[in-house]
Every structure is written in C-alpha cells, then in structure tokens.
C-alpha cells in the first residue's frame, strides 16, 4: 500500500484530495462529509447568484480543506483556518492539485480568530465548523467541545451575515445528538422558531445497504 495517493471528487464541486497514512490515524478525508461538500457548494452558488458578488466563506477547524475547496469551486473568497500547520500545508497541496487558488490560509486558534473578527465587525456569508471533541491551539490553547461549543457559536453568530448566508456545523462527539446540536445553534444565535434550520446524521452506506452513522450536522440557511 502506498504512503500517499490522490483521489478525485466529482460531485457538485470537483476537486482533488491527497490521502496518506499518518501518525494521527487519519488518511486525510472523512468521506461521509461529501453531503456537506455538496450543500456548501449549492449554498455558496445560491448566495453568489442572489448577491451578484463573491461570498466570503470561513472554514474553522478546516483540516485538509475539502469543504474549503467546495466553497472555492462555487466562487467564494475562502478563509481556511486550522491550528495544525501540517494539515494546513496539506490543504494547500489539495488546492494546487485541484487547479484552484487564492484561498487564505490561517494557522490559529479558532476561538481567538472568530472573536477578533467579531470585534472588527467582519461578516461572512458562509461559516463552516467541524470542531473536535478535544484539541489544542498553536499556542497551547485548550478546546473541549462540551465546554466551548456554546460560546463558540455565540461568537460565530456575530460574524455570520444576517441575510443571504449559511452555516454548517459538524460534530463527531458521541455526547451530542442532532437535536442537541440544533438546540445549541438555535439558542446561541438567538434564532426564531421559524428559522430555516435542519439537522441529522451523516452516514456511510455499505454495499449491502446498511448505514454506518459517523457524525451529526446542523445547517442554517438565511
């Protein structure tokens, strides 16, 4: 088995991803996320069509960048942030192999960056979050999902444009259900009852038709 290899995603967006064996037991992609990639591509395209401008999309905890590439394929100005320089470099390779360019790369703690953007009054038409259950920022900042998620979402609510915008939250922690994730987003952002909010599970289906649930998602469309 090779140490590294490339695959091509040809769903709504079309891009290339380098896969490889790593010391942290990942291969560079979580394939169940394809449903989110297609959603991000569609929503970014819709916002661009409605506004006649390039949507600003922020991808937090962005890993190797498939969601960033999906937004970029739809014409967004993308900011890709992760606290691990190694995976940001990996994401940059994926951008180059995909024939894309001009993604903004940031190695920083997500909470710090989002808070600074809020203080500056910067707004994004798309925000994507895929936070881990536990983690550390580049300067030793500690992240624990069940303690930090609500505050993170409150801050994100301050930088998400009030109209013609979307949000995608993905959660892998076993302590969160789709209903709980949706409740956190609704309360943190102060959303009315009739908000266009959806949640559910992302699964992989085997050749026998059995579903393997792997994560939950919460999506908001404005």
Residue map of PLM features:
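Conserved SAM-binding motif I beta-strand of class I
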Residues: 77-82
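Mobile active-site "lid"/loop adjacent to the S-adenosyl-L-methionine
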Residues: 86-87, 107, 124-155
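S-adenosyl-L-methionine
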Residues: 84-128
């Amino acid at each position: 088995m090779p140490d590294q290899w490339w695959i091509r995603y040809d769903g709504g967006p079309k891009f290339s991803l380098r896969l490889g064996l790593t010391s942290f037991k990942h291969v560079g992609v979580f394939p169940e996320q394809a449903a989110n990639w297609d959603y991000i591509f569609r929503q970014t395209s819709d916002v661009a069509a409605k506004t006649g401008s390039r949507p600003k999309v922020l991808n937090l905890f962005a890993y190797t960048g498939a969601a960033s590439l999906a937004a970029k394929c739809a014409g967004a100005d993308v900011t890709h942030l992760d606290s691990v320089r190694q995976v940001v470099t990996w994401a940059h390779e994926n951008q180059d192999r995909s024939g894309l360019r001009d993604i903004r790369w940031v190695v920083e703690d997500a909470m710090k960056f989002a808070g600074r953007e809020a203080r500056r009054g910067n707004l994004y038409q798309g925000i994507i979050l895929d936070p881990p259950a536990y983690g550390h920022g580049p300067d030793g900042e500690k992240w624990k999902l069940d303690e930090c998620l609500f505050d993170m979402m409150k801050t994100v609510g301050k930088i998400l444009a009030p109209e013609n915008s979307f949000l995608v939250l993905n959660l892998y922690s076993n302590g969160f259900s789709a209903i709980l994730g949706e409740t956190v987003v609704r309360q943190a952002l102060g959303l009315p009852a009739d908000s266009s909010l959806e949640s559910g599970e992302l699964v992989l289906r085997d050749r026998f038709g059995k579903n393997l649930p792997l994560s939950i998602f919460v999506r908001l469309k404005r």
